[in-house]
Amino acid sequence: MGKYFGTDGVRGVANKELTPELAFKLGRYGGYVLAHNEDKKHPQVLVGRDTRVSGEMLESALIAGLISIGAEVMRLGVISTPGVAYLTKEMDAELGVMISASHNPVADNGIKFFGSDGFKLSDDQENEIEALLDEENPDLPRPVGNEIVHYSDYFEGAQKYLSYIKSTIDVNLDGLKIALDGANGSTSQLAPFLFGDLEADTEVIGCSPDGYNINEGVGSTHPEALAKTVVETESDFGLAFDGDGDRLIAVDEKGNIVDGDQIMFIIGQEMAKNQELNDNMIVSTVMSNLGFYKALEAEGIKSNKTKVGDRYVVEEMRKGNYNLGGEQSGHIVLMDYNTTGDGLLTGVQLAAVVKLTGKSLSELAEQMKKYPQSLINVRVTDKHGVTDNEDVKAEMDRVEADMNGEGRILVRPSGTEPLVRVMVEAATDEKAQSYAQQIADVVEEKMGLDN
C-alpha cells in the first residue's frame, strides 16, 4: 500500500481526509497517467458513484480535474463498481473511475480507478500517480479555449450493463420468489429492475437511499435484516449486496446465511459439471473455510489460495487463466463475464443454478459443511515475526496434531494495525475457541505489547 492508495483505491472521511481538493488532483494526475494518450487529444473517461451524500461533491471535483487535463468525461450517475469496470472495457474508454467506499459507513468515501481493460490499477500505476501528488506543481498539459471539452451524462450506461448481466444466463427466473437487499447503495434501483426483468417475484428492502443510510443495518454486512424478510415473506432465497455492488451474501429459504465460500462452491460445482471451469480450479484466499476446500476435494475440483484481498484473487486468476475466484466476504469474480467482483452478476448466476437444478438454496449450500471458526486479535511487538517464534510454532504444531486433520490454523499479521490475527477452524465451536485461545495465549506471553 502506498501513501494515498490502499488495497482498494484512495479512501478516507469525505471532506476531511478525502477532500474535494484531493479529488481534483486525483482526477488531474490520475487522468494524466492513465488516460493521456498521445494519439488521442481527448481521452474518454467514465465516472460513476454510489449513493453517499458526499458523492456529488467529490464527483464535481474529480470531473474538474479530469477536464483540466483534456479528458472527455461521461458521467454515469449512481451505478455499481462492476458496472463501471464493465462499461469502461465495453465502450473502449481510456479510464473508468468509481466514487465509493463500498461497505464502509456513510462518512467515508473513496475513489478507485479502472484501466481501459476494466481491471484495477497496478502498483506501478498507483506509484506514478502518488509521485505526481507529492510534487508541488507538476508540469502537465493545460488545454485552453476551445481545447477544453464539455462533460456529458450517460445514465443509459446502467441499462446497458443490466442488459449484459441478463444475457449471461439462458433461463428466466419465473416461479422464484427472491428477496433483495440493496444496502441503500448502488444496486438499490439496479437489482429490483434486473430480477424483475428476469420475471422473478421480488421482495425488496434496503432500496430507499437518502444519501445518509447506505449500509445502515442493511446489505451484505448486515444479512440478518434480509434473513428476517426471507422467512417472513416465504421467499425462496435472498440476495444482499454491499454499498457499491461488488459483493454478494445470500440467505436460504430458512434464513441461514450463505457466504462467499458457499456461493463459490455452488456456482463452481455447476460450472465443473458443464465443463466450464477452467483447469477445474477455483481461486480463493487463505480466509476461506476448511469446509470449502474439503467440499471441493470431494467434487474433484482444485483450489488455489492467495493473500486476503480481491485484487490478489484477480491477479492469480489472470496469471493462471482461471475463471472463478473470490472471497468468503462475497467478492466473487466470474472472469468470463467481468473483471472484478460483481454482486448482481453473481446473484443472477446463483439464481440460475437454483432454477436449473430445481433444488432449494439450503440443499445446495448444505453440500459444503462449514467448520466453526474462532478469531482472536493479539497486539504484538513484531507482527511479522510471530510465526518465526519457536514457542508459537511449537504451540501451533501441538494444536495441529491434536486436531488430526479436522481443523485449520491461520496466524497472520494485520495489514493496518500492530496485531496478529489468530484464526482456528475446528470440528466444534468449543474446540475452535479453545484452540485459538491456547495459541493466542502463547503469542501474548512471548510477543505481546504489554510484555
Curated annotation (Swiss-Prot):
InterPro entries reported for this sequence: A-D-PHexomutase_a/b/a-I (IPR005844), A-D-PHexomutase_a/b/a-I/II/III (IPR016055), A-D-PHexomutase_a/b/a-II (IPR005845), A-D-PHexomutase_a/b/a-III (IPR005846), A-D-PHexomutase_C (IPR005843), A-D-PHexomutase_C_sf (IPR036900), A-D-PHexomutase_CS (IPR016066), Alpha-D-phosphohexomutase_SF (IPR005841)
Residues modified as Phosphoserine: S102
Keyword entries, A-Z: Isomerase, Magnesium, Metal-binding, Phosphoprotein
Cofactor names: Mg(2+)
EC number: 5.4.2.10
Posttranslational mods: Activated by phosphorylation.
Catalytic activity from the UniProt record: alpha-D-glucosamine 1-phosphate = D-glucosamine 6-phosphate
EC class of the enzyme, as a word: isomerase
GO BP: any one term: UDP-N-acetylglucosamine biosynthetic process
One Pfam family in the UniProt entry: PGM_PMM_II
Cofactor binding annotation: Binds 1 Mg(2+) ion per subunit.
Record's GO cellular component terms: cytosol
Binding site for Mg(2+): S102, D242, D244, D246
Gene3D superfamilies: Alpha-D-Glucose-1,6-Bisphosphate, subunit A, domain 3, Alpha-D-phosphohexomutase, C-terminal domain
Active site (catalytic residues): S102
One GO MF term attached to the UniProt entry: magnesium ion binding
Entries under HAMAP family matching the protein: GlmM_B (MF_01554_B)
Family: Belongs to the phosphohexose mutase family.
Function: Catalyzes the conversion of glucosamine-6-phosphate to glucosamine-1-phosphate.
Protein name: Phosphoglucosamine mutase
Lineage: Bacteria, Bacillati, Bacillota, Bacilli, Bacillales
Protein's gene: glmM
